[in-house]
């Protein structure tokens, strides 16, 4: 018996371990852990470079937020570097033939030299072949593209690459001196960023050319330029690397044997850009789930699409479960999304859509595979950041030199290809939800283009709808694989290569387009839920108006019970007709609504007995309601658009998506759109309201600059943990 109990305990422990592993494997947990880590670096925590524990959060912190970086103080780590260096020094002393130490490079490896230090200069010289602006002076002709952006890498990419290269070299497999790694860190600390060509790497023997500009900076090559100055968005200036090192009292490096190859022959740039891309992709994948939940509310959809039975029991793909669980939790407490599907008779829901359309109903199934692909990419790129990716590799313990191909960055390429395709699919889903939201034939009673005033002079969301089509089309183009375009290079020595940096660059572009698309959708979502709030207030008022007019004109003809029944029937007809007439201006819409009352009223007053006085009162009844409802609608529009109802009139209707809505409305100060239209453009354009694009740009910048990361992280931190 004791042994059986012991086995049962072990089984339970194994099960709990498995479940814990699954929980921590979700993209949400990866995002939250990474966000906490990044926040700690931004608050002063130091990044420790030890060759094994570098995270994407650390890469992002060093690359984008100038976080402090220090080399590991472990004696064992330093000893590993020194032992590998000693192997190379001994090989040189003995005159042993070692690739890149006594031989030429690539297809020219059949040449030999006994001048290893000169060989390092020859290596850098032939790799300094990228195209960069010759100066930052004003040009005599307007260029077709920004000269710097079109030819040089953003500083964040370069800083991230330097950190990753340090982390690779410190692993002790590259045969470089400890001082060389320290010098790279000196550049980071001084905020000296080499100006690196955007193009020229095929990421086969690593990112040779880009890394050569880092090496050129370390050696104070006067022809290699750097960005120097107090901050990335301050008075940065482009100066010679020699001048920058002198200004910061950093002594230039004279590269020892193999050290040129040690810097150049690695995947650091590909890994850096991929790391930064995946940090954003993870956030946008979570934000897409928030958008879908908010979209479910804006379209008055049902939470039933995210019910656990569908996803956990019936089709338990991990990504699908995660997406459904997150959206289910986000919608708890919502007064706009229906909590359950009520069973009704055939006649009760006749001519009504029985279920949400695919963009909402199948969103967990659509997003789930993207989540799984991004998770796989995160694992691959994290591993790459903690790998040795140059050639040859040195085993400091045995003295053996290994000639291999760890510089072949196909792991990064594959990660980026699947990430970029996932980005497109996320964008396609957001676009499909967005275009449904602005279409009055599909949006469950919202006005066309989400107009908050008469639609004859308000086409608010139409331009956004067109723009999002452009964005998703570009995403589709960018989703095409890069790796199918590999060309044989360098004397056919590099007959296969990875194009990882090109793929990573394309992924960053794709993420930027998705950010613009999602910013547009978020903007429309906030407008939509405000319109839902306005409509609810209108419904309450019209219901009271109908009750008052029924009592005033028909109390002599009907009993109290009959009046209640008539009132209820008329209100239902009002709601149905309002939903079907949203393309009309308010006056015409209310006339159409009350016209729909006539058949019902005639039937009531002729079905049992003819009531001439009641029949004669029908025109007045319709006129009174039409007039009063139109006036109420106008007052509500005025109060919402003026801000009289507060900045966030829809907050009380939302579930846990409320914080995103309030961030946009309050923190970013983006108001409900339509005041210019309501006043018939009395003050012209751009006076009462900024442009639609300016508002969307504010959301885009908040996502781009990381502010939205905090909002999304805080939102999900507050959600109950999944029990799987």
UniProtKB/Swiss-Prot annotation:
One of its GO terms (cellular component) is cytoplasm. It catalyses: L-phenylalanine = (E)-cinnamate + NH4(+). Contains an active site 4-methylidene-imidazol-5-one (MIO), which is formed autocatalytically by cyclization and dehydration of residues Ala-Ser-Gly. GO terms for biological process: cinnamic acid biosynthetic process; L-phenylalanine catabolic process. It is found in: Cytoplasm. It is an enzyme of class 4 (lyase). Induction: Induced when grown in presence of ammonium nitrate, L-phenylalanine, L-tryptophan and L-tyrosine. There is a cross-link at residues 204-206 (5-imidazolinone (Ala-Gly)). Pathway: Phenylpropanoid metabolism; trans-cinnamate biosynthesis; trans-cinnamate from L-phenylalanine: step 1/1. InterPro entries: Aromatic_Lyase, Fumarase/histidase_N, L-Aspartase-like, Phe/His_NH3-lyase_AS, Phe_NH3-lyase, Phe_NH3-lyase_shielding_dom_sf. The modification 2,3-didehydroalanine (Ser) is found at residue 205. Gene3D superfamilies: Fumarase/aspartase (Central domain) (1.20.200.10), Fumarase/aspartase (N-terminal domain) (1.10.275.10), Phenylalanine ammonia-lyase 1, domain 3 (1.10.274.20). One of its GO terms (molecular function) is phenylalanine ammonia-lyase activity. Its EC number is 4.3.1.24. Belongs to the PAL/histidase family. This is Phenylalanine ammonia-lyase. It comes from Flammulina velutipes (Agaricus velutipes). The lineage of its organism: Eukaryota, Fungi, Dikarya, Basidiomycota, Agaricomycotina.
